[in-house]
Amino acid sequence: YNAPDPRPDYYRNMPSFLYDGQIDKNGNFIGKTWNGSDWTGSSLGTGFNYNGTYVGPSVDMSTYSTLTDLWTSRDDKTTQIDWDALYAANYANNANNPEGSARYMVERRHNDIQEGMLNINYRNTSVDHLTATVGLEAKGSQGIHYKSVDDLLGGNQWIDVDPFAERDIKELATNIGMTQEDINNVKQNNLANPNAAITTGGRLGYDYRINMMNAKLWAQNEWNWNEVDLYYALQFTYSSMQRTTNMVNGRAWYLARLNPDYAQYYLGSQAQNVLDGNYPAAGSALVGYAHHFIDPAFKIGATYKINGRNQLKVNAMAETKAPLARDAYISPRVHDRAIEAIYRHDQAAAYAKRDGTSWLHEYFGASQKMASADLTYSFNYPVVRGRITGFYTQFWDGTELNGYYDDEARTFVNQALTGIDRRHMGIEAAAAVKLGLYFTLTGVVSVGDYRYTSNAYSITSAENGMALAENADGAIYELRDSVLINGLRVATGPQVNTSLKLSFFHPKMWFADITVSYFDWSYLDYAPSRRMKGLYTGVRADGSAVNGWYGDTYTNAIQKDENGEVMYDKYGVPQLKYPYNMLSEQEMLTDNQWYNRFLVDVSIGKLIYLKNRQSISINLTVNNLLNNTRFKTGGYQQARLPRQTRQGVEDSQNSVIGSNVWKFPSKYYYAWGTNFYLNIQYKF
C-alpha cells in the first residue's frame, strides 16, 4: 500500500518495459523505422517526434540485455519476491508512522463452501422390457468468501481502505456533488467500521456469502430388447442465488447514490437505509435480491447391437442452464449487481412488453442453451477392443466476466460479456491390443475443433463508479460494445490429444506401465479488451467514439491493400499491421519444437495379499519423466493495452495505443518438472 509493486512479473520489472517497439517477440532488435527504412540514428530517448515518425529506441540496449540475462539465468533477486525488502519497508514505516497502515502484507483469500444434498430415486420394472425411473435431487449450498490478514511482514496493522478508490477520489468527486465526508466514504471497505485497523487473522476487504438452492425433478424410461436399447428422459431444474454481505462497501454506496433509480442493484433491498446512513449492526448482513430460474432438459439415446461384439450408440440432448454465481455477479466483492440479462429474466413480462419481445425470450435470456449429439461405434474381440466417437455440441448465450486495470481510465474496471455462442465438435478413438500374456498396448486419439461462433456483447463499468464516457447530453454511462471473437478457439486445453500406453501385469500381482502423450492445437485465452469493435472502427456498438483506436496509432495499424481498402479476415475483422497484430491475434501455445509437445509418465506397483482378506498395495508414479518444463498447459492475454500520450501542437495529451505491444506480455502456465508419487495402501 503506497509502495512499489513487489511482484517480479509486474510489467515495470520486465525487460519489455524498457524498450519502445524496437524488439520483436524473440528478443531481437528490429532496426527499422515504421516506414520500413533502416534506422541508423543514436538512442535519442524520446521515442517519437511531433509528426509521428519513429526515430529510434528509447533505452540503452545494454540495459535491456542485462535485465534479460538476469531473468534467463533465474537470478533470485530478479525472479523472486524480495521478502527482506518488504520487511525493511514495514519496519521503516513503523518508525515514521506507527499508527499508519503497513506498506506490505500477505492476505489470505478464503473461498469456502457448505452444502447439503438429498437424493430420492424410484425405479419400476413391472412392464416387460421397460425400466421407469423418477428422481428428485435437492441441494443447498453457501459460498463463504472473505479475506484475512495472513502475515503483516513486520508491520503494526493494516488500515482497511481501498487504495484504488482513495487514489481515484478526485475523479469521482466530479460526477456528483460530494462533501468531504462523502469522499472519505468511497474509499471504505466497510462503512459500518471505517478505517479499521486490522491485525493478523482479521477480516478485511470483503466478506460476503452466496446462498444457492438447486432442485432437479427428472423421469427416464429405458427400453431393452434383444437388438435395440432405447432411453429418453425429461428434467426440470429450479435454482436460485442470493448474495448477502457483512460489509457495507463504500464503492457500492457511491454507485447507489450515483444511480438512485437502481440503488437496490448495488445495496440490495436495504439500499435506502444505507443511503440514509443507517448501516446494519455488527453481526447483521445486507441482503441482496434473490434470483430464480427454471430450466428444462431433454435427452434421448439408442443402442443397436449389430452382433455380440459390435454395436452402435447414438445420443442427443437439449437443455438450458442458469448461470453460475461466478458468471452472474459482476463484482460480488463490492456490490450486489448482476449481469443485465438476469434483471431482464427477473422482470421478463415487463421487458417483453417494453421491447416487443416474447416472455419466453426474456425469461430464458439469462440461461445458456445447449444442444448436442454423438455417435459411437464400439467393438470387443479377444485380442483387441476399442471405440470411435464423433460428437457435436452447440452452446448459445454464454456469459463471461473479466476484471482488469484500464490504462486509459486509470482505474479497475469490470467487463461483462453476454451472448457468447460456441461450437465443440470432434472425433475420439481408443483401442487396446493384448500383446501376449503379460502386455497390453493402449492407444487414444482425440481431435477437436472448439470455436466461438458469434461475437459477444460487452458492458464495461468502473468498479469505483468513475465515468468512463459521456453521451451527447453529457450524461455518464457505461461502455457498451461488441467483442469480435467469432472464429477464435476456445481455450479448453489441447484440442489434439494422443497417448500410447504399454502396460505390464504379472499373475503374481506386479504391474507397470509407461505412457507417451502428445498434445497440439492448444490456444491462449483471449482478452476481450483487445478485440473490442470500437478499437477496429473508432466507434463502439453504442455509437460512442473511441479515444485511441487501432486506426489512430502513430502509423495507423489497420492493414490496407494497394487500393487503400481495409483488409479483413474471413470473419470480418480488420487485419492489423505488425507489430500491432500481436495485441489481438490469438496465440497458439504449442511449442515450435515437436519434441517439447511430448510428456512421458511411468509407474510400477505391487499388490500383496495378507491373511483374513487384508492386503498392501504399493505404487510408485513418476510424471514428466523427461523433465519437459517448456510444455505450456495454458495461459491468458493480459487485458491491459499499452497506452502512451502523443505529444505535439495538435495532439497534446492525446492518448493512443503505444507501439510497445510487449509491455503487458501474456501469462503462461507450464507443466511441472519431473515429480514422484509413492502411494502405500493397507486394506483391512
Model-assigned labels for residue ranges:
Residues R103-R108, M117, N121, N156-W158, ...:
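Extracellular loop and loop/strand-boundary signature of outer-membrane beta-barrel proteins
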Residues R123-T131, E227, N307-R309, V383-R385, ...:
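Short loop/turn motifs that connect adjacent beta-strands in outer-membrane beta-barrel proteins
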Residues L118-N124, V134, L217-W223, F236, ...:
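Residues on the lipid-exposed face of transmembrane beta-strands in outer-membrane beta-barrel proteins
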Residues A3-Y19, S148-I159, N246-A263, A328-R337, ...:
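Flexible, surface-exposed loop regions and adjacent strand-edge segments
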Residues Y1-V248, K305, R387-I388, T442:
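Face-selective signature of the C-terminal outer-membrane beta-barrel domain
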Residues N224, R385, G390-N402, T411-R530:
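Gram-negative outer-membrane beta-barrel transporters
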Residues Y518-Y580, K606-F684:
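C-terminal beta-signal and adjacent terminal beta-strands/loops
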Residues E115, H129-T133, E137-S141, G154, ...:
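Structural signature of Gram-negative outer-membrane beta-barrels, strongest in the C-terminal barrel
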